[in-house]
Swiss-Prot record:
Coiled coil: none annotated. Residues 112-126 have a biased composition (Basic and acidic residues). Its main location: mitochondrion. Lacks alpha-helical transmembrane segments, suggesting that it resides in the membrane via beta-sheet conformations similar to those predicted for other outer membrane proteins and porin. It comes from Coccidioides immitis (strain RS) (Valley fever fungus). Residues 101-126, 366-386 are annotated as: Disordered. It holds the Pfam family MDM10. Component of the ER-mitochondria encounter structure (ERMES) or MDM complex, composed of MMM1, MDM10, MDM12 and MDM34. Associates with the mitochondrial outer membrane sorting assembly machinery SAM(core) complex. Belongs to the MDM10 family. This is Mitochondrial distribution and morphology protein 10. GO terms for biological process: establishment of mitochondrion localization; mitochondrial genome maintenance; mitochondrial outer membrane translocase complex assembly; mitochondrion-endoplasmic reticulum membrane tethering; phospholipid transport; protein insertion into mitochondrial outer membrane.
């Protein structure tokens, strides 16, 4: 489960219409969410609040063995008025990373397009999509030696975003050296067809570049940009990218490349369209899935992942890694299972009332709410008038060494609780290798 501040940052990105999926950094996000999730450490309590639409605070306290904590503040020039901030109202799927459904890339809206549009086509949301919005975030970790993390995020243009991350650690009392500090600058450019990221870090003067290219029609052309919005022609997306790092001070070089093939929402809707007069002719399975292949030539590491969304509440993922130099391999498998609770709609009667359908025909009862639009997120409404909401999720992962992680995240009253355990073989002893607990933790979040 992500922190409250991370949730606000994701909301800021969505409000400014920044596509987080069109980046080489997010190439393996789905597999990482299903296989590389972490369990809470010890007992941690998070108290958060979105006091105003532009200001948020978070206080964190960790206990059991070692007492530590942090204080976080966030300010946004863009008011997040419609953002659910209470822990009882925040959708659980917004806080728990899982299978990510990739959508067709769209070209960012430019100011010229908004100016030449008709007056009735102009909306405040469209104008805010290219405004130079800014977000400031700072976190102070306690106790001493304290660490200060800061983030400055600004939308420079419809296709460009600037990010400055600062990390400063207080020096020990006996040390006469200056406090350790580093600044990471990242300039991101996204056109829909491709994305590029330029990085510079003051730590060893590290320079970096990341790029991602999407095969298929160019969304920047007006003729092709409207197709995904109307007919949803594309059912799959193939992306290729890479990254490179170099430090002139330490002579460190890093290089990696990767591919991603994923189904788009149109592939999942082929089942519904097949019953119409124009059946779908898509050879792709209706189950959403994502395939990735990453290669690090310098270290000889090769990794492949396969993630499948078997149902709206069940997802599977697997990863196989191999090193051509050391002949070492890695196999990891994981899954997540969502549990939904059913709430009776106010306009429906109990199951014992068999005449409710007749009363609706006569106008004695209000009609049932319409079925939801395809592609809705966590909550849905059944034809019987029952509203389904995500209540909890269970995540499980296991590797070839029988290291097991089990995580449960859900809502308990007004609290968001995350509890996990880790099992695995311990260090070899005289009696042989033993199998036991490797970690246990509980995290509690309450926000207003």
């Amino acid at each position: 489960m992500i922190d409250f501040m991370d949730y606000i940052q994701l909301t800021f990105s969505d409000a400014t219409h920044w596509n987080r999926d069109n980046s080489y950094t997010a190439l393996t996000d789905t597999a990482n969410a299903l296989l590389d999730f972490s369990i809470p450490e010890r007992l941690r309590v998070h108290l958060s609040s979105l006091s105003t639409p532009q200001f948020a605070t978070t206080y964190t306290l960790g206990t059991v063995g070692l007492i530590d904590g942090s204080i976080s503040y966030l300010f946004s020039t863009l008011p997040l008025e419609s953002t659910p901030s209470r822990s009882t109202l925040i959708p659980l799927r917004r806080l728990v990373p899982g299978y990510r459904q990739i959508h067709p890339p769209l070209a960012p809206e430019s100011p010229n397009e908004s100016r030449h549009a008709e007056p009735n086509e102009r909306s405040e949301k469209a104008l805010q999509s290219w405004r130079k919005e800014t977000m400031l975030h700072a976190t102070l970790h306690l106790p001493p030696p304290t660490t200060l993390n800061g983030l400055f995020l600004r939308r420079i243009s419809p296709t460009t975003q600037l990010s400055l991350a600062v990390c400063s650690t207080q020096a020990t009392p006996l040390s006469k050296s200056t406090p350790q500090a580093s600044i990471l600058t990242q300039l991101s450019h996204d056109t829909g067809k491709y994305s590029a990221e330029f990085l510079f870090s003051t730590d060893n003067a590290l320079l970096g570049f990341k790029g991602l290219w999407n095969f298929g029609p160019d969304p920047r052309h007006a003729a092709t940009a409207q197709r995904p919005r109307t007919a949803s022609q594309s059912v799959s997306l193939l992306s290729a990218g890479g990254e490179m790092y170099y430090s002139p001070l330490s002579s460190v070089v890093g290089l990696s490349t990767g591919l991603r093939f994923t189904t788009l929402p149109a592939a999942s809707e082929s089942t519904h369209s097949s019953s119409s007069t124009h059946p779908a002719q898509s050879p792709i399975s209706t189950f959403p899935y994502t395939l990735t292949l990453t290669l690090t030539p310098l270290t000889g590491s090769l990794s492949t992942t396969y993630s499948l969304l078997a149902s709206p509440n069940l997802a599977f993922s697997s990863r196989f890694g191999f090193n051509v130099y050391s002949w070492e391999s890695e196999m990891v498998a994981g899954c997540e299972l969502w549990r939904r609770k059913k709430k009776r709609h106010a306009s429906t009667l109990s199951d014992k009332d068999d005449l409710s359908w007749a009363k609706r025909k006569m106008g004695l009862l209000p009609p049932l709410p319409p079925s939801p639009v395809k592609g809705t997120s966590a909550s849905a409404v059944t034809p019987a008038g029952e509203q389904k909401e995500s209540d909890s999720v269970i995540k499980l992962r296991v590797d070839q060494s029988l290291n097991v992680r089990l995580l449960w995240e859900g809502r308990v009253k007004d609290l968001l609780v995350s509890a996990g355990v880790g099992l695995g073989p311990s260090l070899p002893s005289i009696g042989g290798t033993t199998y036991g607990w490797t970690g246990v933790g509980v995290s509690v979040l309450y926000s207003t």
